[in-house]
């Protein structure tokens, strides 16, 4: 069933497939390019030639029937790549129109050399005049974006914005060199106009802005090419410089290659307690419980309101359910003491509410988790909203200043969506989305554990190890109620089984299963992403966690950086 899903990033060689599981900052690459070229005994102009040819090969294979290419070149080395592509397209017999942006400074040396090589084969270009209407040939059937590269931060300048908006409106395919113009290579922010590419060819290493933030609206299918630098990039010095991991479809086999022991029993496969489901919110805790069971937890117990006992047992008779009658008599606190003594993993939040029940549950969970540091505590949904209230409570001002108002819980996992993240960080949602990696680091520091920041290009960060990952799975169909509740169940159930190396790997693996399950639903019989329900993910989970390793697979168990 996994074979129905396409990888979001293509790579050709085995080493490229390894390298595209890692992400480096664009700034690091700019500094490293001279050494990369020197390792091949070539100069930067030759490296640009490799990049342009690699991009041309990708685009020509995708659009073999497109005969008139419009190539837009900017004033930097991204434009230099465009000149190389133009030359190869012309030499292959295609009609090529090159439009260049005005620039007040000379082109970089490498771009100048590429421009001269284009002119040497008879190529011409037309400079775009700001403020004048952009007139394009009517028979153009492919647009190649070489306007802005990986160095941009903030919105494109006005005349670049005008050109970008114009080409986005053209009814023809668009492809981007290295990164779509207008997209921040470090964060995935599109602060202004941004080219909406159908395909993007990127070189030497993946950059975070291609994978998270607003990237999925603009990058299209990603194609990674190492330009012959695989051996240089795979060396320890370069791997140690990587910013984070990219967790993707192929990692399923690494995470779940270990089969369950033939002599396993329910007690050895993990015990989970889920706490939630206040009055009116029973569906959330039910979905969490079902997901927890389906990913393989040995025993699952739920603490919830009395009215949800019967529905839970009807839907999931395998679950043990305890009714929470009242939160004022100490009943819930005692139940939480017993839960932490019994379980290996606890999750608080699905359908919890922010009333007295939720407040009592969170208080008891934090207190018990501090006393049971070996247990994993997952906090989601209203548990996070209540945590934010604690964090920013005026009554706790003195404690906030002293840093003693929340315990340090290295085995905790928080799973905020951008709205919950903004409340935890006392900022705007836009501030979270502006730099999701930075936000995840700040969020993980709140309890000293692991943060899973939801959204396209989910970001996972572990405070204690410093490891970060971007989970490149899932789709827009996950923008519906209940998805987070399913994820909470997956996290709790997987953590309880102690299959992974650490909490970071557990969090990455659960997020991957969640995203791949949604991709499986979308891929079935041309289903698509609109109208996917959270409960539809659950039946797909066993096919993911029990996936057989393909005979050609070379993936090893993923490890964080």
From Swiss-Prot:
Q: Which cofactor does it need?
A: K(+)
Amino-acid positions noted as binding K(+) in the UniProt annotation, renumbered to this chain: 78, 145, 181
Q: Which reaction does it catalyse?
A: (6S)-NADHX + ADP = AMP + phosphate + NADH + H(+); (6S)-NADPHX + ADP = AMP + phosphate + NADPH + H(+); (6R)-NADHX = (6S)-NADHX; (6R)-NADPHX = (6S)-NADPHX
Is Isomerase tagged as a keyword?
yes
Query: Which Pfam families does the record associate with it?
Result: Carb_kinase, YjeF_N
**Which key words are in the record?**
ATP-binding, Isomerase, Lyase, Metal-binding, Multifunctional enzyme, NAD, NADP, Nucleotide-binding, Potassium
Region (ADP-dependent (S)-NAD(P)H-hydrate dehydratase), start-end ranges: 249-561
Binding residues annotated for (6S)-NADPHX 2, in chain numbering: 351, 485
Q: What is its EC number?
A: 4.2.1.136, 5.1.99.6
Region annotation NADPHX 2: residue ranges?
417-423
YjeF C-terminal domain sequence ranges: 249-548
Name the residues that bind (6S)-NADPHX 1.
160, 178
Identify the HAMAP family for this entry.
Answer: NADHX_dehydratase, NADHX_epimerase
Q: What is this protein called?
A: Bifunctional NAD(P)H-hydrate repair enzyme
Q: What is the source species?
A: Leishmania braziliensis
